UniProtKB/Swiss-Prot annotation:
Belongs to the Thz kinase family. Disulfide bonds: none annotated. GO terms for molecular function: ATP binding; hydroxyethylthiazole kinase activity; magnesium ion binding. It catalyses: 5-(2-hydroxyethyl)-4-methylthiazole + ATP = 4-methyl-5-(2-phosphooxyethyl)-thiazole + ADP + H(+). Pathway: Cofactor biosynthesis; thiamine diphosphate biosynthesis; 4-methyl-5-(2-phosphoethyl)-thiazole from 5-(2-hydroxyethyl)-4-methylthiazole: step 1/1. This is Hydroxyethylthiazole kinase. SUPFAM superfamilies: Ribokinase-like (SSF53613). CDD domains: THZ_kinase. It comes from Methanoculleus marisnigri (strain ATCC 35101 / DSM 1498 / JR1). Its cofactor is Mg(2+). The gene is thiM. It is an enzyme of class 2 (transferase). Substrate binds at residues 58, 207. Gene3D superfamilies: 3.40.1190.20.
Length: 279
């Protein structure tokens, strides 16, 4: 067997069969992913969920979310375009998901930009059992309390080491943290996974962060280890971005290619090209 441990380092690369097996499970089980998400990217999130191999539902009326989430394999809460009614729906659905053991993925879009947004993210974290907190570096830095810069919904980065910021956030919130960036960082506060798949074109298209949360939810719906599943999801999404960017002429040809590449991604493709390093 080849040695996949870097010389002089405790880091090792995760066997590609692991993310490949999770992608195969998503495709075979086709879990329902319930989204309470933002109005800007809702259609893209629904379609990327289908491309990953899962099934989306976008119900957010407080009167029906408890019933809808009961049929789901995972729940996504995305605070991109907040309202009081939507927050109520998130709390109702989140509590019901917790009762049923359904994993909840929280995307704290733009946390730190306004008091309402920040208070909502903290309320969801304090009230619900969040399985995965998926955000960019600025958002995770804000929630970690270590310093993060957010302008609108865009990240300005973190003040310190990204890995330690993500680790601190995971420890303080009790969640798996999935922090996207040039290199994605996934940690449960102890283990750290660095995901090297992706392309800068993904940063130039609105909604890729939200879509990453949808793909993450599809993977955690079929997994017991949410950190590994989150890393596998980002590797799959990032690989689709790499391959989609290769022939794209601009943001909208890239957008189409991103969907097409994820839909066409096979477990063997992911096994051979996922770049996930464990520390």
């Amino acid at each position: 067997m080849p040695d996949n441990t870097r010389e002089g380092s405790s880091a090792r690369f995760v066997d590609g069969a692991i993310p490949a097996g999770l992608l195969a499970a998503v495709r075979s089980q086709r879990p329902l992913v319930h989204h309470i998400t933002n109005g800007v990217t809702i259609n893209d999130c629904a379609n990327i969920t289908i491309c990953a191999g899962a099934a989306p539902v976008m119900a957010e009326a407080p009167e029906e979310v408890a019933g809808m989430v009961a049929a789901a394999g995972a729940l996504v809460l995305n605070i991109g375009t907040l309202s009081a009614a939507q927050v109520e729906a998130m709390l109702i659905a989140g509590r019901r998901a917790n009762e049923l053991g359904i994993p909840v993925v929280l995307d704290p879009v733009g946390v730190g930009a306004t008091e309402f947004r920040t208070a909502t993210a903290r309320k969801l974290l304090d009230t619900l059992d969040i399985a995965v907190l998926k955000g960019n570096a600025g958002e995770i830095g804000v929630l970690a309390g270590t310093g993060g810069s957010v302008r609108g919904v865009d990240s300005g980065g973190v003040a310190g080491d990204p890995v330690e910021t993500a680790r601190e956030c995971a420890r303080s919130t009790g969640t798996v943290v999935s922090m996207t960036g040039a290199v994605d960082v996934v940690t449960d506060g102890s283990r750290v996974f660095l995901v090297g798949n992706g392309n800068p074109a993904m940063d130039r298209l609105s909604g890729t962060g939200c879509m990453a949360s949808s793909v993450t939810a599809a993977f955690v719906a079929v997994a017991e280890d949410y950190a590994v599943a989150s890393a596998a999801a980002l590797a799959a999404f990032g690989l689709a971005g790499e391959w989609g960017a290769a022939g794209a002429r601009g943001p909208y040809t890239f957008r189409t290619a991103l969907f097409d590449e994820l839909a066409g991604l096979s477990p063997d493709d992911l096994a051979g090209h996922a770049r996930i390093e464990e520390r």
